[in-house]
Amino acid sequence: IHGGQAEENVSEPLERVPGIFALNRQNYAQDLLISSRGFGANSSFGARGIKIIVDGIPGTVADGQGQISHIDLASAERVEVMRGPFSVLYGNSAGGVVNVSSESGKPGAEAAPYFSVGSYGQLKYGLKVDGEQNNVNYLLDAGSLHTDGYRDHSSADRENYNVKLVFKIGEDTSLKLIANSVNLSALDALGLTAAQLQSDARAAGTGALSYDTRKSVDQTQGGLVLTQRLGADDTLVMAPYDGERHTIQYLASGVNGVVNLRRDFYGMNSYWLHTAQVGGMPFKLVAGVDGNENRDHRLTFTNSGGEALAAATDQNYSMEARNLDFYVQGELRPSERVALTAGVRQSDTTLSSESNNTLPSLGSHTYQAATGMLSAQYYVQENTNVYISYGSGFDTPTLNQIIYSPSYVNYGGKNSGNIGIDAARTQQVEIGLKSKLFSTAQLNVALFDADTTNDIVIASSNGGKTAYMNAPKTNRRGLELSGQWQLPYQLQASIAYTALDAKVRQTYIEKITSSAPTVTTSYSVNSGNRIPGVPDQGLFAELMWRKADNGLEFAVEGKAAGSLAANDLNKADAAGYGIMNLRAIARQTVGGWSISEFARIDNVLDRSYVGSVIVNQASSQFYESAPGRNWLAGVKAAYRF
């Protein structure tokens, strides 16, 4: 996370994880395009199909929409990723779980300022304070980021604040308090057509300047995690949270082209941990209840050249999502070599929307499902195991996915909403191997196959508005491989490779009709078409030299990705690419100060490539270009009191 990295986007650590694609749009107004095994690739913003958790507090709300802008990498200690069948027990997320943990304070007290500058006017600075005294462990971090942006009309300013306090209350009780906040203001460069990309990859897309497309976000959330031991074999954990998020977004359209969204979200996850012996066999059990709710007040206005104007077509909706889930998971060890795991989760999610003006309400819909997983693990030897797992998943639409009808996105007129979208259901099988080879190498290999019915796919995207529909059958299958090696001469090597075949498995028809019945567009999405927004291959490789006695470190990074489709028809795509990065770090100790400097050059060979796409963009503005050769340099210092 911290070794010569920008510590700017969660894509930095995630690119080292096989199965995860975190495509950087170079657009802070739209977030990263994150997918896990192809799930989440259809998200128009934020993280969809992936559960986000930060210090035990969910970053994913009741309807399954996740936000990542509040993740503070400057104070993150680790980022854990769970993929496949085990992730279904986390609820409304079929693809995986991203769990971020902040650093813990070290004994005494430490103050650590940091500063970095880079290409395209990038400037980041902040201060981190941590320590531990009298059974109180604390971390406080405040950071600011500015960038002029790689593309025209893409500058951004972001401030992150993160607080973590852990109180040790006696021998059996601990209380962790979490609070974080993000303030973001970003211009939106939109996507480019193929012709625009060829002409000027750094230009803003059509409509960005005339509508002054942009986004501002203010989010604050807090929570606590109470851990209470109830004896030698039992532990109770309760984690309530509460937060609010205010978003104002100017889209590249006139009518309803300004969205003012206020969201309140809250909930609690409580679970019981139990260890026992069953017939002389070790047994672990976790059972819990997870309840969440988010309430949105959504206003829209007309975007007149970047100014918000009231109009008769303005929307005024009160929207709500709530879920109440029960889950249980057990692990039995019949022998030292065998581990058996099973779990089930009952989910109940309701989405509703009421109009506060003369426009019609969108109605309500309740989704219910029981999902589960089974896994068998066999230890060939102490540090090597093979496993097979099965899991079923459940993925409801978000409030954002039901707000627009396809005909409204394409033609305007009356918006009837899209409350009738079904939940996607997934059956997934995985086999794999995990091995630590001697003391110098580690290798993980996994093969997976996931069948989805009623997959939620993008019907159309235009002017910042996106409409969705169900695809009858899709499939995602692939290979994931990761390895790490300690080599002679103080060298270390690592690799993460993904091969993904994500395709439609049953032909379906998309029909989009305007308010005038004579204007209808109908087309076929054929079986065998690729699911857009996700590459068919991905590779991250690194060779690092580190000299322990003087703190010097040099590394070469290689990144490559296969092509990705930009629309369901597979009539547009972005070519694959390969780039190389270099980084260097130096560390010193001067008096009570620990100092480190770093510098990195990304895309050393100055390759031109597309970093991300806007799936099914109605005006063919699919492409979001990535930077050419660029640099970043910074310094960190820490003083212990």
Which positions does each model-derived feature cover?
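Short acidic/polar hinge/loop motifs at secondary-structure boundaries
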Residues: 10-13, 41, 49-50, 57-83
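A beta-strand signature from Gram-negative outer-membrane beta-barrel systems
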Residues: 61, 70-114
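Transmembrane beta-barrel wall of Gram-negative outer-membrane proteins
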Residues: 110, 117-146, 151-189, 214-231, ...
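Membrane-embedded beta-barrel scaffold of Gram-negative outer-membrane proteins
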Residues: 136, 229, 235-249, 379, ...
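Conserved C-terminal beta-signal and adjacent last beta-strands/turns
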Residues: 168, 180, 328, 388, ...
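Face-selective signature of the C-terminal outer-membrane beta-barrel domain
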Residues: 172-182, 216-356, 379, 444-447, ...
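Surface-exposed extracellular loop regions of Gram-negative outer-membrane beta-barrel proteins
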Residues: 185-198, 293-306, 348-355, 364, ...
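Gram-negative outer-membrane beta-barrel transporters
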Residues: 272-274, 335-340, 348, 442-451, ...
